[in-house]
Amino acid sequence: MQGPSQSQLRRCYDEAANRAASFARREYPHLAGILVHGSVARGEPGPFSDIDMLGVTNRKKKPADFSYFDGDIYVGVGFLSVAELEKEFTDPRAFFWARGSAETTKILYDPKGVLRRIMLRWKKTKPSHQILEKSLWDEYHNIIEYSGKLRNGWLKRNDFLTRYSARVIAEHVERAIIALNDLSIISENYLWRQILNARKRPMHLRTDYPLALGIRGTEEVAKVYRSALRLCQETLRLVKDEFGGKVKHARFRQLLKEPLEKHGL
């Protein structure tokens, strides 16, 4: 059965987004701006996409988030203060996703140009050394931690723990690659492609990443285990090689000096 064309979907979702923005403006007249993220902002919604809308306020007290159905379209409306939106510039966990999202964010209401100013700033922003170091330190730590859980699962023949640990490792490897390559993540839809095409990446990423993450299915737990362990080993060494000489914090430097082979990695 042939569904609606892309142009029909785009028109339908744009109309629903505009209705949602009008509703938010009526209910909350003091909003500083309204924007929409995701596939609707990019002009590529699918037939079952949702609308991810954000209202921005200058006030300390924010309205409660809410959601509803507009016909068959699910609409989610969240709220952030201008200060919270600007805080993402210094948040290691939010930075790369927020910058990527800003590239395709669609502004629906911005009477004083507040959102345009913030979006323009994102386009010119590079991560600070502090953001890079904190991001890579966190991922280095988490990869080591879950390598232990992975090996415990394998040793105890606990398939769930082995597969779960492998998936978590793959997710932390994603974040390490994002930081090492200074990637702007547009959305989950593009993450896979951006990770695999990154210049700085583990040698066997194309084999190990999909197996560890679980998006290339296999009944053989041994394959998942071996791929996840190799992904750990190669990513940890990649971080050491690419960023080790730039680390400023003494405790992170000390951790990087610890021989990985000594710990089975």
PLM regions and their residue ranges:
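Conserved nucleotidyltransferase catalytic core and NTase-mimicking acidic/glycine-rich helix/loop elements
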Residues: K126-L265
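Metal-dependent nucleotidyltransferase catalytic core
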Residues: M1-S49, L54-E103
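Short amphipathic alpha-helical segments, especially helix-boundary/capping motifs
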Residues: A16, P29, V40, R121-P127, ...
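Conserved NTP/Mg2+-binding pocket subregion across the NTase superfamily
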Residues: Q2-L9, F66-S67, I73-R157
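Surface-exposed beta-strand edges and their flanking turn/coil or helix-capping segments
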Residues: S49, Y68, F89-R93, W122-K123, ...
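Short N-terminal helix-initiation segments at or just after the protein's N-terminus
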Residues: M1, D14-A21, R42, L108-R116, ...
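Generic hydrophobic secondary-structure signal
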Residues: L31-V36, I51-V56, V75-V77, I107-D110, ...
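Acidic-enriched, low-complexity/disordered segments with a strong bias for Aspartate over Glutamate
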Residues: D14, D50-D52, D65, D70-D72, ...
